[in-house]
Amino acid sequence: MGHQVDGLIIATHNNKLEEYQHANLPIVAIDRFLRADIPVVASDNYAGAKLATEALIQRGCQHIIHTYTTNPSNWHDNQREKAFQAVMADHHLPAITYTTAFDCPPAERTARFERLFDEHPAVDGIFASNDLDAARLLSLARARGYRVPADLQIIGYDGAQATQELVPELATIIQPIEQMATYAVKLLADRMAGKFTPTSTVLPVNLKTGQTLKTLS
């Protein structure tokens, strides 16, 4: 690998992560922890999840469920879960979480979400840790007759352009994806030049209220 590339930016789920970690190359990671000496560029996942959970509570939700994907290399889902638990505790509300593995087949993931509605028919708020899951949950909820946002409010996380184009009404936490990528490139260039680079860079996020959250009165 070292004879083919000069440096690596790792930003997606990849089965070769272990190989990358041991490559004798400058590496920068986006939103995932690989090794203590590898710089990470991330959005403020804790603050974003706090913002999402509080947005649901401010709009009257009392039975909120958090769905997130487990992956050992992704610190962001863990930060989002921690924030969700903390905010729910602060408001003395029950914190319910549904987890799925990152490599969970789509049919199995859908079945898991169907069980969510079966087991918690009174759910009135869902915070999904990614927009794809939020869109899937929105579709399932509507198929079951939930009126969104009158009966059920949903918010995702990512704000990727593709999802916003496909599901423009979805409320979500928007990550500064372009800024993260630009900064990761700068960090990699600095590492390749032998310059000092911070081990962690955290960028702020924003809330897009969309149409799956109620309007605050």
Task: Label the model's feature ranges.
Residues 53-64:
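Glycine-rich phosphate/diphosphate-binding loops that line cofactor/substrate pockets in enzymes
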Residues 6, 61-63, 124:
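Short acidic/polar active-site loop segments enriched in Thr and Asp
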